[in-house]
């Protein structure tokens, strides 16, 4: 799923400079091509999922098309209020993508489980 997602966002960004890729501390090498080819369309917020969502909403309010992407557990649990207030209630065009459903990242411990 991750590689397919990254390929599609890459293709969209190549066609439209308004497409942005936002990540929260996913410093994986799978982003190397995107970072190299679209440095002004890539933003890494570090371990700050809520701020990533708020920034995505701000970018969307300016006509950008942000894709916010990170581990599902952190996206759902740490960002819920920001998603609710900044994206949903404001009706912002933000694409929110979480990876690692269930126990996919089980080896990293219970903080990374998306099971509730």
Which positions does each model-derived feature cover?
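Thiamine diphosphate
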Residues: 1-116
């Amino acid at each position: 799923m991750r590689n397919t997602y990254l390929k599609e966002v890459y293709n969209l960004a190549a066609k439209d400079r308004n497409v942005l890729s936002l990540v929260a501390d996913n410093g994986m090498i799978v982003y190397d091509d995107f970072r190299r080819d679209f440095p002004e369309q890539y933003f890494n917020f570090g371990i700050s999922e809520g701020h990533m969502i708020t920034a995505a909403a701000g970018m969307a309010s300016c006509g950008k098309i942000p894709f916010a992407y990170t581990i599902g557990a952190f996206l759902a649990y740490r960002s819920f209020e920001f998603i609710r207030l900044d994206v949903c209630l404001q009706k912002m065009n933000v694409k929110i993508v979480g990876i690692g459903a269930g126990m996919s990242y089980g080896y990293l411990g219970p903080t990374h489980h998306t099971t509730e």
